[in-house]
From Swiss-Prot:
<dbReference type="GO" id="GO:0015344">
    <property type="term" value="F:siderophore uptake transmembrane transporter activity"/>
</dbReference>
<dbReference type="Pfam" id="PF00593">
    <property type="entry name" value="TonB_dep_Rec_b-barrel"/>
</dbReference>
<dbReference type="InterPro" id="IPR039426">
    <property type="entry name" value="TonB-dep_rcpt-like"/>
</dbReference>
<feature type="region of interest" description="Disordered">
    <location>
        <begin position="526"/>
        <end position="545"/>
    </location>
</feature>
<feature type="short sequence motif" description="TonB C-terminal box">
    <location>
        <begin position="898"/>
        <end position="915"/>
    </location>
</feature>
<keyword id="KW-0675">Receptor</keyword>
<dbReference type="InterPro" id="IPR000531">
    <property type="entry name" value="TonB-dep_rcpt_b-brl"/>
</dbReference>
<dbReference type="InterPro" id="IPR010949">
    <property type="entry name" value="TonB_Hb/transfer/lactofer_rcpt"/>
</dbReference>
<feature type="signal peptide">
    <location>
        <begin position="1"/>
        <end position="24"/>
    </location>
</feature>
<feature type="compositionally biased region" description="Polar residues">
    <location>
        <begin position="526"/>
        <end position="540"/>
    </location>
</feature>
<protein>
    <recommendedName>
        <fullName>Transferrin-binding protein A</fullName>
    </recommendedName>
</protein>
<dbReference type="InterPro" id="IPR037066">
    <property type="entry name" value="Plug_dom_sf"/>
</dbReference>
<dbReference type="InterPro" id="IPR012910">
    <property type="entry name" value="Plug_dom"/>
</dbReference>
<keyword id="KW-0998">Cell outer membrane</keyword>
<comment type="similarity">
    <text>Belongs to the TonB-dependent receptor family.</text>
</comment>
<dbReference type="InterPro" id="IPR036942">
    <property type="entry name" value="TonB_rcpt_b-brl_sf"/>
</dbReference>
<dbReference type="Pfam" id="PF07715">
    <property type="entry name" value="Plug"/>
</dbReference>
Length: 915
């Protein structure tokens, strides 16, 4: 904050002006001793800003570790809570699949940590079971936020900075170093955080240790997390729910009597037939349970989830005596588990399902007959894989996901604060990173209510069933990076030049394994009674002449479903794609005096891939990306900004592998997706704060979708070849983005210093969607990835010394636009039909959040937040989007949408300690 003070001439000033020269003359005459004062150095750690990489800062958001703490960011959904225009993509099983920005999501938004690309969203093409459609996880590994020094979010094409994937934007994380924990002037530092989040009963415990002895230094961060599912508003799950369950009742037929041989201890058929049992048939019985225990499409609550995360980061290093040279290493391991049960799958059989299965399977031997008094033993039908399943057991569908990331590397850093050599900054690094997503699907039918994930079929549980399916997807990178920065002047023009180089050897591997089922049978046979006084007996099931059957202990049968080489989902042949890539980028941000800043960047990327499978669409891609920006400064309080940039996304590993339908397919040529971004803004700035408004235009082309090549034959459109991933679509969007922060003390110095207000707004509009004429069986691009227009208004106070602060935030979201969910599908016969992404869209909603902090003796900071203060019931589009056709694991068969309700009033607390 700057203030202007007017100098007023008065009697006191005149007296001092008159006296001081005389006093100075007397001192000089007395030849007083001169005294050299000690030089005072003030050091401050450089904070990352929006304009570090690109001169305009348009579309950029930067969050430091302090910002993450203040906003109480504990997971990926908290990171962008108050940032309109960027949203989390829900994976459908508790995990996430990256971010959505400007109408694109998942692999079209780059996600990197220290320049290392994180795993791609890889979705297998066929259903595992239950109500989810993806064979593999489809998730993107999440970042441990306690390891993060800063995160830069870029909205709009950004491949010149982040390479492939930055088609619509990028999210780049930077890892902490020892300096971020060691306080100024100290040789060691300890930081601890304990946090609790009420929305998911999440508990976080993190501790960071750092020390420096001579030139040696090290940092160790250990973080553990445990949480459940995000709980819906209490009103959404209030009450009880009822359902039908198949129960055994006596068969009314007069030909439904039987006796069991093993139960006739004292005689044969003639003696035992006096006490026959009756066959059972199924009849629906109404049952009522709590909303938490209910299973079925009308479930009110979200699926139960158990989430755990364990992470550690170790960064040792040595800084040489002149402090210009640093050599260090990095070791990181993070493992996250997401264990959930799909409770939209009914646990119990109903008469309708039972009869339908019976009709399809035909007559089943022994149906209706049971041993002892266990009537449920007589109710069974044909289930999945034609295995018999009994009505007495409940069905459970479970997804266990384990995400494991390991990284180790070396780095050399050269820093020249004097800026008197060829480089002000240079960094050379080598990293080896491996990320694996282990997705295990289990379907059980062997416990009373289906809740036991660990039950298995056994001989004493006839008609019990178990199915397993496991898909493990992994990616590895061996990345060598070099970065150089230099500032210099030419003809009174300031240049900030940077050069970046990189070389990567990478691999992608998908393993399909543990794909089998187990089924418990029972021994059953229809017996012929022995002759009675030489007369043959022929039972007919009547009460006086019941059937004579044998029911004994059965066995468990295990069948492998895995096949090899059949080119369908059951194909368990490992998939591997390997390759290499390199890039070279140069950027120069130029200051043209006080009136203008100009920046431009250029990047060249090369990627080559190969596979042992000749039907994989591998190949070589060469791409050129660029950006340019200008800031005009006609006044101290005004900036006029404009930038343009390009982006691209290379075909993903899943797209290269292709769509397999059983036939031998041929590799196809897939070009990179391309984007072009234009953005113009105006910035008002001063002691009052700043306010930025911008307009953007994003054009996408060569979007990759699954479909067929089309050809005209005999005047009619016909398909050509097999289904494949092809470049087929283009689209264009425009929008408005507003950001602002007001310092009220700067507006009027009578107001308290530290009082501020913030404002953010984002709106996106779809302008154009096109399909290539030589493509068919193509779904038009549905913009379900666009976040509804959103306003975020805040006001808060930070005590000038940082001892305490409080903040209130109002978030208002408009309804989801129906036009963004409507599209059409080009059919094989040349016609088209209208389509809709999902059956529901969200209504407008608003919430109020309040948070604050208090620091005790500079070492302890207590933070607390009340979210959805007014306990408003609402549903976010990000949650409902899990039912959309483009969802990673689409939620199907959804009867009610209560389960997508956001949390009601909830609380977050954290205690931070720094020494």
């Amino acid at each position: 904050m700057q203030q202007q003070h007017l100098f007023r001439l008065n009697i006191l000033c005149l007296s001092l002006m008159t006296a001081l020269p005389a006093y100075a003359e007397n001192v000089q005459a007395g030849q007083a001793q001169e005294k050299q004062l000690d030089t005072i150095q003030v050091k401050a750690k450089k904070q990352k800003t929006r304009r570090d990489n690109e001169v305009t800062g348009l579309g950029k958001l930067v969050k430091t570790a302090d910002t993450l703490s203040k906003e109480q960011v504990l997971d990926i959904r908290d990171l962008t809570r108050y940032d309109p225009g960027i949203a989390v993509v829900e994976q459908g099983r508790g995990a996430s699949s990256g971010y959505s920005i400007r109408g694109m999501d998942k692999n079209r938004v780059s996600l990197t940590v220290d320049g290392l690309a994180q795993i791609q969203s890889y979705t297998a093409q066929a259903a595992l079971g239950g109500t989810r459609t993806a064979g593999s996880s489809g998730a993107i590994n999440e970042i441990e936020y306690e390891n993060v020094k800063a995160v830069e979010i870029s909205k709009g094409s950004n491949s010149v900075e982040q390479g492939s994937g930055a088609l619509a934007g990028s999210v780049a994380f930077q890892t902490k170093t020892a300096d971020d924990v060691i306080g100024e002037g100290r040789q060691w530092g300890i930081q601890s955080k304990t946090a609790y989040s009420g929305k998911n009963r999440g508990l976080t415990q993190s501790i960071a240790l750092a020390g420096r002895i001579g030139g040696a230094e090290a940092l160790l961060i250990r973080t553990g997390r445990h949480a459940g599912e995000i709980r819906a508003h209490e009103a959404a799950g209030r009450g009880v729910q009822s359902f039908n369950r198949l129960a055994p009742v006596d068969d009314g037929s007069k030909y439904a009597y039987f006796i069991v041989e093993e139960e006739c201890k004292n005689g044969g058929h003639e003696k035992c037939k006096a006490n026959p049992k009756k066959d059972v048939v199924g009849e629906d019985k109404r049952q009522t349970v709590s909303t938490r225990d209910y299973t079925g499409p009308n479930r009110f609550l979200a699926d139960p989830l158990s989430y755990e995360s364990r992470s550690w980061l170790f960064r040792p290093g040595f800084r040489f005596e002149n402090k210009r040279h640093y050599i260090g290493g990095i070791l990181e391991r993070t493992q996250q588990t997401f264990d959930t049960r799909d409770m939209t799958v009914p646990a119990f059989l109903t008469k309708a399902v039972f009869d339908a299965n019976q009709k399809q399977a035909g007559s089943l031997r022994g149906n209706g007959k049971y041993a002892g008094n266990h009537k449920y033993g007589g109710l069974f039908t044909s289930g999945e894989n034609n295995a018999p399943v009994g009505a007495e057991y409940g069905t459970g569908v479970f997804y266990d996901e384990t995400h494991t990331k390991s990284r180790y590397g070396l780095e050399y850093v050269y820093t020249n604060a004097d800026k008197d050599t060829w480089a002000d900054y240079a960094r050379l690094s080598y990293d080896r990173q491996g990320i694996g997503l282990d997705n295990h699907f289990q379907q059980t039918h062997c416990s009373a209510d289906g809740s036991d994930k660990y039950c298995r079929p056994s001989a004493d549980k006839p008609f019990s069933y178990y199915k397993s399916d496991r898909v493990i997807y992994g990616e590895s990178h061996k990345l060598l990076q070099a970065a150089f920065k230099k500032s210099f002047d030419t003809a009174k023009i300031r240049h900030n030049l940077s050069v970046n180089l990189g070389y990567d050897r990478f691999g992608s591997n998908l393993r399909h394994q543990d794909y089998y089922y187990q089924s418990a049978n029972r021994a059953y046979s229809l017996k012929t009674p022995p002759q009675n006084n030489g007369k043959k007996t022929s039972p007919n099931g009547r009460e006086k002449n019941p059937y004579w059957v044998s029911i004994g202990r059965g066995n468990v049968v295990t069948r492998q479903i895995c096949l090899f080489g059949n080119n369908t989902y059951t194909d368990c042949t490992p998939r591997s794609i390997n390759g290499k890539s390199y890039y070279a980028a140069v950027r120069d941000n130029v200051r043209l005096g006080r009136w203008a800043d100009v920046g431009a960047g250029l990047r060249y990327d090369y990627r080559s891939t190969h596979s042992d499978d000749g039907s994989v669409s591998t190949g070589t891609h060469r791409t050129l990306s660029w950006n340019a920006g200008i800031v005009l400064k006609p006044a101290d309080w005004l900036d006029l900004t404009y930038r343009t940039s390009t982006g691209f996304r290379l075909p993903s590993f899943a797209e290269m592998y292709g769509w397999r339908s059983g036939d031998k397919i041929k590799a196809v040529k897939i070009d990179p997706e391309k984007s072009f971004n234009k953005e113009a803004g105006i910035v008002f700035k001063g002691d009052f704060g700043n306010l930025e408004a911008s307009w953007f235009n994003n054009a996408y082309r060569d979007l990759i979708v699954r479909g067929y090549e089309a050809q005209i034959k005999d005047g009619k459109e016909q398909v050509k070849g097999n289904p494949a991933y092809l470049n087929a679509q283009s689209a264009r969007i425009t929008g408005i983005n507003i950001l602002g922060k007001i310092d009220w003390n700067g507006v009027w110095d009578k107001l308290p210093e530290g009082w501020y207000s913030t404002f953010a707004y984002n709106r996106v509009r779809v302008r154009d969607i096109k399909k290539r004429a030589d493509r068919t069986d193509i779904q038009s691009h549905l913009f379900d990835a666009i976040q509804p227009s959103r306003y975020v208004v805040g006001s808060g106070y930070d005590q000038p010394e940082g001892k305490w602060g409080v903040n209130g935030m109002l978030t208002y979201s408009k309804a989801k636009e129906i036009t963004e969910l409507l599209g059409s599908r080009a059919l094989l016969n040349g016609n088209s039909r209208n389509t809709k992404a999902t059956a529901r869209r969200t209504r407008p909603w608003y919430i109020v959040d309040v948070s604050g902090y208090y620091t005790v003796k500079k070492h302890f900071t207590l933070r607390a937040g009340v979210y959805n203060l007014l306990n408003h019931r609402y549903v976010t589009w990000e949650n409902v989007r899990q039912t959309a056709a483009g969802a990673v694991n689409q939620h199907k068969n959804v009867g009610v949408y209560n389960r997508y309700a956001a949390p009601g009033r909830n609380y977050t607390f954290s205690l931070e300690m720094k020494f």
